Amino acid sequence: MTEYKRLGDYIREVNVRNRDLKVTNLLGLSVSKEFMPSIANTIGTDMSTYKVVEREQLVYIADTSRRGDKIAIGLLDKYDNAIVSQAYTVFEVTDHELLLPEYLMMWFRRPEFDRYARFHSHGSAREIFDWDELCDVMLPVPSITRQREIVSEYETLTNRIRLNNQMIQHLEATAQALYRKTFVDNIDKENLPEGWRIGTLGEIATCLDYKRKPLSEDERKPIKGVYPYYGAMSVVDHINQYIFDGTYLLFSEDGANVIDENGHPALQYLWGKFWVNNHAHVLQGNEIVSTEYLYMALKEVNATHLVTGAAQPKINQENMNSIQLVIPSKENMDEFNKNVNLIFSYYKIATEENLKITELQSLLLAKMGQ
């Protein structure tokens, strides 16, 4: 078993400011431990006080309040440099022949590290995981050769996920192009082909909102499991029970991102067993159209006029059901389904493979502590 070492013996804090304003790439940091373009309003802000981060340096946010069970920490590996908020702590590994930054970042991805950081955060108004606490973290530091092997295994899995994500995006774009070619391009809504008509979403979709059920965090804690628990935009949790089993489309009901910057509704195409709370409408195609058709058609819709509420934007069921869509003939729909179902079969295979690979990554992270 590898001996545990004190992290502070391998890292040092870095505090370089953007005095010459040469670095303009402003990044934020998420609890998913990834850097992302900052959405902060920087008009009139003195960017010379921001901290500079170089490739292979790490950044963390000491304030762990309001971030759930995770700590925001990341390794800059996709950019040569960037700038971050003055509130962030920048640090680096002092000797890459003793500890690889990539290996260290793998340790930070472990849920055990998040629990450790939350437990060792202090403060009343704000909970802080300070620099001294970070330095006191104990971790196994195997030989540099073994570290490289572990990192290589993890990055092989990460690269496979990346390739699958590219394939998923390509398949979805292909399905959307097929939809547009069949039902949008060169189609005159005032003079539709024989057997086609304009109808409403409520006519062609089965809404299953009556089956959904919200569960509070306290209600979910004793029933943790493998089934996804979905909210308006994504998976919120995993529990040991499910309501739905099959292929469905979730249509975001409320929240700040109920529509995107182009006015399109927030959608989630799902299959398998899962639970949904009351922040997303649950739809399926009926005997007229397929669920895949609904997905492609609704991605084209501008739903801006359907949103109500200022403090809490919302698209209620009545407004959603009023969306007007082209309803093609059965022959055209059958032909479309034959082609699009093949596309989505590959889409599902790639997505499910990513889930399995993610499980392998979790196992690899777990083995680091053994």
Label each residue range with its predicted role.
Residues L76-D77, G123-S124, K189, E217-E219, ...:
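Short, solvent-exposed loop/turn elements at beta->coil junctions and helix N-caps
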Residues R55, V59-R109, G231-M233, Y242-K299, ...:
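A short beta-sheet element
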